[in-house]
Amino acid sequence: MFKCWSVVLVLGFIFLESEGRPTKEGGYGLKSYQPLMRLRHKQEKNQESSRVKGFMIQDGPFGSCENKYCGLGRHCVTSRETGQAECACMDLCKRHYKPVCGSDGEFYENHCEVHRAACLKKQKITIVHNEDCFFKGDKCKTTEYSKMKNMLLDLQNQKYIMQENENPNGDDISRKKLLVDQMFKYFDADSNGLVDINELTQVIKQEELGKDLFDCTLYVLLKYDDFNADKHLALEEFYRAFQVIQLSLPEDQKLSITAATVGQSAVLSCAIQGTLRPPIIWKRNNIILNNLDLEDINDFGDDGSLYITKVTTTHVGNYTCYADGYEQVYQTHIFQVNVPPVIRVYPESQAREPGVTASLRCHAEGIPKPQLGWLKNGIDITPKLSKQLTLQANGSEVHISNVRYEDTGAYTCIAKNEAGVDEDISSLFVEDSARKTLANILWREEGLGIGNMFYVFYEDGIKVIQPIECEFQRHIKPSEKLLGFQDEVCPKAEGDEVQRCVWASAVNVKDKFIYVAQPTLDRVLIVDVQSQKVVQAVSTDPVPVKLHYDKSHDQVWVLSWGTLEKTSPTLQVITLASGNVPHHTIHTQPVGKQFDRVDDFFIPTTTLIITHMRFGFILHKDEAALQKIDLETMSYIKTINLKDYKCVPQSLAYTHLGGYYFIGCKPDSTGAVSPQVMVDGVTDSVIGFNSDVTGTPYVSPDGHYLVSINDVKGLVRVQYITIRGEIQEAFDIYTNLHISDLAFQPSFTEAHQYNIYGSSSTQTDVLFVELSSGKVKMIKSLKEPLKAEEWPWNRKNRQIQDSGLFGQYLMTPSKDSLFILDGRLNKLNCEITEVEKGNTVIWVGDA
């Protein structure tokens, strides 16, 4: 090759001497030494040979290109019009990649392209010896740049397969890192740990990448990813360019436990670190939180922290964080919410004669479970414990046998946990009842007075029953008139020989009023507890069947069917329910402008530590969805779709420990029942199935026990929910009782524990289960219940009613009797006969 160039060089000098200068058409102001410049720039061979041939061959036709030299970037063409030889800009240059910058600031793939551009632009363009133009211009768009990098990875992958005869092992991220490491090693020709522009040029030549990179070149790597602008690419910058993100999470921080007190704010920080760490994504119950518009979780911060503005017990649970796109490296945060103790004592005061037994009980709720202690007149009673003075049920009860005058005092129960302290006083007076003293004024035999009574609504009116001695305190007859009105409690219906009452649902409103539905009279009666009289009738839509008292907003919700066939059900609300004012109903906002689809509704009940509920749900007939409602505005908020789980909701229960809703589903057309579906109250998202647990869910007042009744399988399943919202495996109880209703009662032997009582829809027994141990017992011989067809208002044809936080009695009706159970002794206390269809029972009182 060098010999050929030498011949041309010599000939160039010879003919310049003999022929003189080239014509002016040869280029823009070309000098006599232009051939030397041309040869140094390696002018395209066809153009060079044409010029040499034109000088050497003297006898060719004057107008042909044989004798015409056009200069760099141009070539000779014969005009179709004149037939004369003319110079024109070259159509294309031979493919050859040696990039240069032109004085016009543009990037050119080789010298020929510079001269061709000078011809086309009719301007002088020289070579500029720097690389600034390599990084200018916008031909290489972001999308094209990404495509180029993907293509480079594909090429490297193919190389690896050819060299190793196998695919790279590991996950996508590990494989990508391996390929980028190998690519960098190949690019870094001098192995100095840096890739410069010359090495990129060398790769372009070796791999012939000049025209195949989507309007991009390898130089764009320096333009976009030279992080420190030193015109070199280090391995870390290569990682950045190809998004090989190396994340780190210390082993001891993979699991983080955070506790906050209810009502405060909380910040969960993600410990995942790494250069170019992508944005942090947070999940709860596998639902991404970043994309949700949540009131209480609405700021993720520049550092990716999760910020909870006002902590509640619904926020309890596990949160995971990871860098976007790198979910395999994640940190788990166990978030626990502590709640200060709330105490109730019973009784607040009592008087006892010397020689009898006195009991002072304390119930405390909080998270974690509070520790209990007692003071007498400000002094710890622990050193004074004896056979006569004992602590029972894990310290929740002070038991004094054979009381003496010196036992008189103020007994203070103190509850403590990590979040705070609470206390309350129970006063004991010991003296002769015949003496007219303060103690005599405060005298209150347990079970006497207007409180601590069962109210039973049956065919012959309303009976008020004291459970200890099973005594009637009051009988409100059907013919009794409403206080101040002429209306009767149960007017005689046409065709009836005997004046009878028909009742459905009833609710206790702050131990002040009882609201009770009369479905055949299209109204709700209000019973005043103080006077034990019916004081008002509130008209409703036809056939009111279900009432619920929303204590948070002091309103009673009323579900009416419209007809006995449930053809036009509606929801109404009675506001200011505990007020001494005339009451009336207002309609809720229809969901989808349709009232006639309402099948049921659910509003969680408040507890000692959870005193406010904001939301409820409406269930539509045969619809696999929940309609969320705002209890304050009584308006629709959103729909939670359950179609993916093929669940038409039939029953709901709620625990504040994590804010979970448990949904019992209706059987399908074949009678099969799908497992319960769980919904997260924080995100309103479906979490999934509650394992394989089926049936009607019930949750204990403290939120810790979920009891599910599957009547088809005769199965009772008990699950425990921890203070961290973890749902533990169930234990099973098989029974053929066909459970109708369930009641929870605080344990008399263990603090912070509950027992359940289940009534039977077909049999004469009641099921007892000690939830902490799984101990089971039957209380027998309670007579047959009402037949299901005799109680059309709901599925609970045999109700069972507890007697409050400290009460030891429960009541359950049979077809024509009432049975009072003693929960402390786990036995039947008494039977009250001649009470027909008394399946609406309410407890009023402290205990």
Curated annotation (Swiss-Prot):
Location in the cell reads: Secreted
| Record key words, sorted | Calcium, Disulfide bond, Glycoprotein, Immunoglobulin domain, Metal-binding, Repeat, Secreted, Signal
Please give the biological process terms from Gene Ontology that the record holds. cell differentiation; regulation of BMP signaling pathway
What does UniProt give as the signal peptide span? 1-20
Disulfide connectivity for this sequence is C89-C119, C93-C112, C101-C133, C270-C321, C362-C413
Chief location bin: secreted
Q: Which InterPro entries match?
A: EF-hand-dom_pair, EF_Hand_1_Ca_BS, EF_hand_dom, Ig-like_dom, Ig-like_dom_sf, Ig-like_fold, Ig_sub, Ig_sub2
Entry binding sites for Ca(2+) 2: D226, N228, D230, H232, E237
Q: Where is the Ig-like domain?
A: 250-337, 341-426
Q: Which residues form the EF-hand domain?
A: 175-210, 211-246
PANTHER family, alphabetized: FOLLISTATIN-RELATED, FOLLISTATIN-RELATED PROTEIN 5
Name used for this protein in its record: Follistatin-related protein 5
Species of the source: Homo sapiens (Human)
